[in-house]
A protein has these predicted regions:
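Loop-to-helix entry region of an early transmembrane alpha helix in multi-pass inner-membrane enzymes
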Residues: 88, 94-98, 102, 110-128, ...
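Membrane-lumen/periplasm interface segments of specific transmembrane helices
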Residues: 31-45, 207-216, 220-324, 338-343
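Multi-pass, polyprenyl lipid-linked donor-dependent membrane glycosyltransferases
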Residues: 124-125, 147-176, 196-212, 362-368
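Transmembrane-helix signature of polytopic, membrane-embedded enzymes
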Residues: 116-117, 133-154, 172, 337-344
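Short hydrophobic/aromatic helix or loop-helix immediately within or flanking a transmembrane segment
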Residues: 61-112, 353
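Transmembrane alpha-helix segments characteristic
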Residues: 333-356
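Transmembrane-helix motifs of polytopic, lipid-linked glycan transferases
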Residues: 105-106, 117-140, 320-324
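Membrane-interface transmembrane helices that cradle and orient dolichyl/undecaprenyl
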Residues: 177-188, 220, 379-380
């Protein structure tokens, strides 16, 4: 009796494929469990108990805008046309990108409410985040990959992965973009980049990374083909911004709707001095502006200024990712395409909010530095274990700020 062909022997069975999903599934469950415990130890802004398993516990100011886009599309108007006592600035929801709310709209077609659909999109994206990270780490359980997944469950700012925000969806898209670069699939990389740019302005970092990919990816191709793949994937990714602009124009009649509301209502226009913005972000008085009512639990009381520790941790994480990349480059004389991509994206995600002037929202945008875990997976356990401990403490503090309504 002849043996089966090698292609059959090498093909993973259904049981093997399911087994490969167990570590990311476990990470997703642990992330929800940890976040629920933090919510249980916190209070809502009105002093009531946090209902983590309800949609109300996952909504913040921006979530209302994303839901409004999912329900009725874009709108822009002079505030005083509707609110007589309001400053004469522009109101509406054109300051928010469509990738996430359009996904929510698609899921709501199943009959689920928009609120539940929003949570489904966020949680499904979070599971996808762990699954793609697991693939990028080699899909083999070791102490290094296990610790990396553990860090991912308490990643800085990761509480927003569970919220009605595009952070999880945008992060998944960036990881898919990195996976496309690793596989040599410019189409997959372009698709991930498109979704990332359609979810949030920070996602535009994918365009820059894909342009640079000609120098570190597509290595089996000639230089001319590498340049074409890099340029084509970056162009497709940039179409996420064009789609956003087109949707806003269709609803408002203005191609500059996003820029107009940012400048009129939020004073954000042009490029800022990043170090000045870091200083403003560090000193922003969240605890004075948004203090929960009534008696505060210990965790909430000690978390009202947690964004300051968050900035230190985020800066340390960027330095760790860059240092790991440099060590691997010196030792091995090369980096994998996915490692180059992850390093570039991590640094860019850290800097973009400060160039844009996002002093009230940088901490959630920085959660997309999750892509840097691709490199952290190669770090020593003497680095990974302290990082896990630091991230765990900071995750609890920032999570408590979120559930208490201190963060927006």
């Amino acid at each position: 009796m002849s043996a089966p062909p090698p292609s059959v022997l090498s093909r993973p069975s259904r049981r093997d494929r399911m087994g490969r999903l167990l570590p990311p599934a476990a990470a997703w469950l642990v992330s929800n469990l940890v976040t629920w415990l933090i919510a249980s130890s916190s209070v809502a802004g009105d002093g009531s108990q946090v209902a983590y398993w309800s949609t109300a516990g996952r909504r913040r100011w921006d979530a209302e805008h994303y839901l409004s886009i999912a329900k009725a599309g874009y709108e822009m108007f002079r505030c005083r046309d509707r609110y007589a006592d309001y400053p004469d600035v522009i109101c509406g929801n054109v300051a928010w990108f469509p990738g996430y709310p359009m996904s929510v709209r698609a899921v709501s077609a199943t009959g689920l409410s928009y609120e539940i659909s929003a949570v489904v999109v966020s949680e499904a994206s979070l599971f996808g985040i762990f699954a793609v990270l697991w693939y990028l780490l080699g899909a083999r359980l070791t102490s290094a990959t296990g610790l990396t997944l553990a860090i991912g469950t308490v990643f800085p700012g990761g509480v927003y992965f569970h919220a009605m925000f595009p952070i999880a969806t945008g992060t998944l898209a960036l990881l898919v973009c990195v996976a496309g670069v690793k596989r040599g699939s410019w189409g997959l990389a372009a698709a991930g980049g498109f979704v990332a740019t359609a979810c949030h302005l920070v996602g535009a970092v994918a365009v820059g990374m894909l342009l640079l990919s000609a120098f570190f990816a597509w290595r089996r191709d000639t230089w001319s083909v590498r340049l074409v793949k890099a340029g084509a994937s970056a162009a497709v990714a940039a179409c996420g911004v064009l789609w956003t602009t087109w949707l806003m124009w269709q609803a408002t009649g203005r191609w500059d709707a996003y820029e107009a509301i940012q400048q009129s209502s939020y004073g954000q226009s042009g490029v800022r001095q990043p170090f000045d913005e870091m200083r403003k972000a560090y000193g922003f008085p969240f605890g004075d502006w948004y203090r929960p009512e009534g008696h505060l639990p210990w965790l909430v009381e000690h978390s009202l200024g947690a964004h300051r520790g968050q900035l230190w941790l985020n800066a340390a994480f960027v330095l760790l990712v860059v240092a790991t990349a440099v060590v691997r480059l010196v030792r091995d004389r090369r980096l994998g395409a996915e490692e180059w991509a992850a390093a570039i994206l991590t640094v860019a995600v850290f800097l973009v909010p400060f160039f844009a002037g996002a002093e009230m929202s940088w901490y959630r945008n920085h959660a997309q530095m999750f892509v840097g875990l691709v490199l952290v997976g190669h770090a020593s356990r003497w680095v990974q274990v302290p990082l896990l401990a630091w991230c765990s403490v900071q995750y609890a503090l920032l999570g408590s700020m979120f559930f208490a309504g201190v963060l927006v």
